[in-house]
Amino acid sequence: MASPFSGALQLTDLDDFIGPSQECIKPVKVEKRAGSGVAKIRIEDDGSYFQINQDGGTRRLEKAKVSLNDCLACSGCITSAETVLITQQSHEELKKVLDANKMAAPSQQRLVVVSVSPQSRASLAARFQLNPTDTARKLTSFFKKIGVHFVFDTAFSRHFSLLESQREFVRRFRGQADCRQALPLLASACPGWICYAEKTHGSFILPHISTARSPQQVMGSLVKDFFAQQQHLTPDKIYHVTVMPCYDKKLEASRPDFFNQEHQTRDVDCVLTTGEVFRLLEEEGVSLPDLEPAPLDSLCSGASAEEPTSHRGGGSGGYLEHVFRHAARELFGIHVAEVTYKPLRNKDFQEVTLEKEGQVLLHFAMAYGFRNIQNLVQRLKRGRCPYHYVEVMACPSGCLNGGGQLQAPDRPSRELLQHVERLYGMVRAEAPEDAPGVQELYTHWLQGTDSECAGRLLHTQYHAVEKASTGLGIRW
């Protein structure tokens, strides 16, 4: 069975095929307790374990649990036992919360919010032969039918992610003389790429990665901070679910950086892939085309949600195109009408340049897929990377081809992907600078574009994963 996680998470060395019980990938130091002697373990018929001490006393042993917090994105669980990691990130967990709400008193219920990505919407539209707008409205109807209170479009949170990426690039470009690691700036929306960078290249590569949060995590801030205030609720009273094209988003949501210590809650409580939503529809016995449409919800009064929106620049969010246009205008006073992509070795590695009188002013690139990411990093290490900005995505062909997207058994994958791309492109594109409600939230929620609040809620940080040297790595 193919792993649903990205290639960047799966591929490390050649000796990567291991069973989950063969090696411990995250050793835990166990303190030896004084006076402890030899004990026996008894296994009962029901599968429970009991420790039998020398004095005849017994103690029931608790089962060890592995959650996403334990994940190092290393060569063990992700390769051979990823199902162990996602017990708290599945449609079954959503069903448990909805069932608990039905049984609880009104004061004890949690407000359930679902945020749907444009990529997942396009994949579902292809499967059900609907247009993206009808898919969005019928999906809203379905979620509300099973007990969800609000359904949002993550294209709205992507406005903020794009705007912050634009501003960060301009700041770094202007300050590159003072900071050797200012450029190139590498996009940060792909969690598979981030996990790979933290684990494999650490302190060398991390200063180059944009600190702007991904659309999923910006939506987490919007829902658990702004929207919670509007609803007069604490963040822990909201259960926030996102629908994403990628299994790696489950790992992103589980990062400690996105955990609210004060209220003991995550910005995103549960991530469902497109495929998991499809299974949820099947389990509920619902045919999406048969549902009556319902309008999407708006996060604030200034934001219209009559129909879903998207952005120019491709199915991975359009980071290269939006940063390129903004930088050309802001730094050089040049308005770019059309962005021209130049394919290099393959379609997943393309370049864009801004030239004036024969001089290259801006040199951008997009690198999709693990092979191209490795080539990019090697060029950086050799000091031969000519780019100012790179849109990096772990999946070949980008997010529309994510591991969590729906597959068609009776249709070639390339043909299906092209169909999903066409459907994705049918949605009205909106410039983040002109999006209704965005500037209102910058003013009233974030207290300005460069405020401490904006930095805290729209940006993040990265952590190099130290490689533990243990006897488990020895081969005899």
Swiss-Prot record:
Classification via SMART domains: Fe_hyd_SSU
Binding site for [4Fe-4S] cluster 1: C24, C71, C74, C77
GO biological process entries: hematopoietic progenitor cell differentiation; intracellular oxygen homeostasis; iron-sulfur cluster assembly; regulation of gene expression; response to hypoxia
GO cellular component: cytosolic [4Fe-4S] assembly targeting complex
Tissue specificity field: Widely expressed.
Coiled coil (UniProt feature): none
GO terms, molecular function: 4 iron, 4 sulfur cluster binding; metal ion binding
Role: Component of the cytosolic iron-sulfur protein assembly (CIA) complex, a multiprotein complex that mediates the incorporation of iron-sulfur cluster into extramitochondrial Fe/S proteins. Seems to negatively regulate the level of HIF1A expression, although this effect could be indirect.
Protein name per UniProt: Cytosolic iron-sulfur assembly component 3
Species of origin: Homo sapiens
